[in-house]
């Protein structure tokens, strides 16, 4: 079930974060995101186990996905698409688009985003470190 993330899940989310990203956010950063009233922080939880999460924001017109990850044990089960859909549904009626950046080498994520309607909009050179890599900017129009 996907719902608003809760503080009791932060340690599990941090473990997924560490496994998914070389520049993982700390538990403190995740807690700050949870407390951000302008943010959207959702988690997919089954029987008390966090299987994935998505963190983003919206300025009223543009949604932005900062982080999305699914635990390795639960990938390829549609959880990523469910999280993207839940994020889009959490946006206000005024939202017109969603954007995100993804490592150029992350083909599985690029494929997921493309299957959800995101299109490549540009490249941010050397956006990532550890290892140094370009970021692909992807945007999806929101139709409500």
PLM ranges: what are they?
Residues 91-101:
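Conserved GNAT acetyl-CoA-binding A-motif
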Residues 4-73, 81-90, 141-144:
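Acetyl-CoA-dependent GNAT
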Residues 26, 107-110, 114-126:
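K/E-rich alpha-helical interaction surfaces of small helical-bundle regulatory domains
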Residues 37, 61, 106, 128-134:
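Short acidic/glycine-enriched loop/turn segments that link adjacent beta-strands
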Residues 99-101, 119-136:
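Conserved catalytic-core motifs of GNAT/GCN5-like acyltransferases
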Residues 67, 71-85, 103-111, 115-116:
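Conserved glycine-rich acetyl-CoA-binding loop
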């Amino acid at each position: 079930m996907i719902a608003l993330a809760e503080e009791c899940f932060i340690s599990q989310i941090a473990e997924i974060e560490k496994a998914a990203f070389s520049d993982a956010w700390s538990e403190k950063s995740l807690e700050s995101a949870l407390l951000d009233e302008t943010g959207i922080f959702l988690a997919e939880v089954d029987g008390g186990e966090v299987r994935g999460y998505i963190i983003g924001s919206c300025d009223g017109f543009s949604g932005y996905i900062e982080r999305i990850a699914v635990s390795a044990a639960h990938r390829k089960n549609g959880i990523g698409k469910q999280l993207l859909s839940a994020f889009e549904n959490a946006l206000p009626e005024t939202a017109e688009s969603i954007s995100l950046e993804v490592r150029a080498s992350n083909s599985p994520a690029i494929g997921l985003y493309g299957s959800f309607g995101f299109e490549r909009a540009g490249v941010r050179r050397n956006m990532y470190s550890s290892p140094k890599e370009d970021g692909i900017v992807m945007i999806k129009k929101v139709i409500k």
